[in-house]
Amino acid sequence: MAGFGLPNFGQLTEAFRKAQQIQQNAQKLQEELDAMEIEGSSPDGRASIWLSGNQQPLRVRLEPSLLAEGQDASETAILAALQSAYEHSTTTMKEQMEELTGGLNLNLPGMSD
């Protein structure tokens, strides 16, 4: 009986089933993002930074020629590489979350533009 504006039991059961599936998929996605290595590089390619899909720093590579140019050049290149890696990582995370939610428009914190 679906009186008094309450959903019927079948709809409620289906909603819970979908919620459980999303939760399982979210756990799998978390593991996949943790395992990813996403590279960002400075425009000249002499500085590279790798982040996980969850923006955890993993590695840094600096070419000796960059270090020879001094602190300012090194800092500028490192910042550019970090910004590039962060942009790639957040884009990847957003795309993966959109796949997970299947366009449910959940409006998750930190996932909006």
Swiss-Prot record:
Belongs to the YbaB/EbfC family. It is found in: Cytoplasm, Nucleoid. This is Nucleoid-associated protein P9303_00241. Residues 90-113 are annotated as: Disordered. It comes from Prochlorococcus marinus (strain MIT 9303). It holds the Pfam family YbaB_DNA_bd. Keywords: Cytoplasm, DNA-binding. The lineage of its organism: Bacteria, Bacillati, Cyanobacteriota, Cyanophyceae, Synechococcales. Binds to DNA and alters its conformation. May be involved in regulation of gene expression, nucleoid organization and DNA protection. InterPro entries: YbaB-like_sf (IPR036894), YbaB/EbfC (IPR004401). GO terms for molecular function: DNA binding. Homodimer. GO terms for cellular component: bacterial nucleoid; cytosol. Transmembrane segments: none annotated. Its main location: cytoplasm.
